[in-house]
Amino acid sequence: MNTPLRRVSIAVMVMVVALLANATYLQVIKADDLRSDPRNSRVLLDEYSRQRGQISAGGQVLAASISTDDRYKYLRTYPPNQLAPNSPMANAPVTGFYSMLYSSTGLERTEDQVLNGSDDRLFGRRLFDLISGRDPRGGNVVTTIDPVVQQVAYDQLFSRGYTGAVVAIEPSTGRVLAMASSPSYDPNLLASHDGAQTSEAWDQLNSDPDKPLLNRAISATYPPGSTFKVLVTAAALENGASPDDQLTAASTITLPDTETSLENYNGSTCGGGATASLREAFARSCNTAFVELGINTGADALRDTASAFGIGEETTSLPLPVADSTIGSIPDDAALGQSSIGQRDVALTPLQDAVIAATVANGGVRMAPHMVSQLQSPDLSNLSTTAPDSRGQAISAETAATLTSLMIGSENNTGGEGKIAGVQIASKTGTAEHGTDPRNTPPHAWYIGFAPAEDPKIAIAVIVEDGGDRALAATGGSVAAPVGRAVIAAGLQGR
């Protein structure tokens, strides 16, 4: 071969290699990025040419796809309940949204392969649709959510103008009955095929200082305040303490090796004597007594008990992503004293606090929380069913029974609206300081509990940020307890 021809051959070969390399790069290495690029209209057209499956709860459709006349064959919708026009907002923390421009969140994201029909378990269905010429359809997601409890949980927050969250769990199974967050948003606005409308809604939601897109039930952590005393008491009881043990009743206590003092609510003493029993200190939620109790119990026991309740453990069962809860570092007894009243670096999601209540209610057995009951094929045949998943005996049945008794005492000592006639609730309130100037910042108000105390059917956690409508005067009993009791009342209907 002469030199010019050789050069031409080499040039052609180099171009072929470059073409193959570029094709490989685009089709293999960059394939996922290109598929997920919202500007890729071919991907959008393909996704919207299939009827996406439904998300449902208690027989009610929370999300569905309807046919349209535009180039995108199906529109994702979140239909309102006839009795609750704001139900799409109530359900948004569960469903999330499915958007042409902004991807997806919630179950729309975590169960996307089932909903869009690409799940491996639906291969036979896809093949049948291809051979028969039928339009492809996605599978369905059946949730554990009780739509009545979910709506009540959201309405209790929304109607009062509260920013916060509610989680309700069935103690014996871990089924999540409600997961509400307020303020919320209408996912229909982000599912629109009108790009301008979707962009405007997105900008408004993201610029809102109240963060309506944030699922506060699982994506935010808060100091739990006195609700953490349930866990501290569990640690103490598991390590030999008794409800009759005497603790300081002083109005203030100085943390070891510091000049920092902590005080009881309103600077009051814990009863009329120099000491108070653990039972009385729990009912009155005395900070000084619990600083002493926590230090006497020890940091290792507190860490072990926190771990047994699932704190620090990744939550994969939901199946939504959940922020990590933590008790923080405890380098010395001063830190231990602060942590023992649910302050310092202790930070829990509302879901985690609900799990603590549910574990006590379930005789000390911790069940993994889950929100998907069943995955179905398009013809409603079963793909998988979520079975209750025990994560072990967090505390003994005896300790759980003692805690239940103490929580009954706390409920009976707590004011606020909404007490349910004929139903004994076991509960614990919390009023948690936060921020750089906690004494002048409205506290977060907490309420965790379960009912009926003698045969628990529902366990709940309520967080109301920044004192709700009570500002600096807020307490868990006055602000969060009425919300929690209303949710419990709804959850007990038919159970």
Tell where the protein language model's regions lie, with residue ranges.
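Beta-lactam-recognizing serine transpeptidase/beta-lactamase-like catalytic domain environment
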Residues: 176-226, 231-467, 476
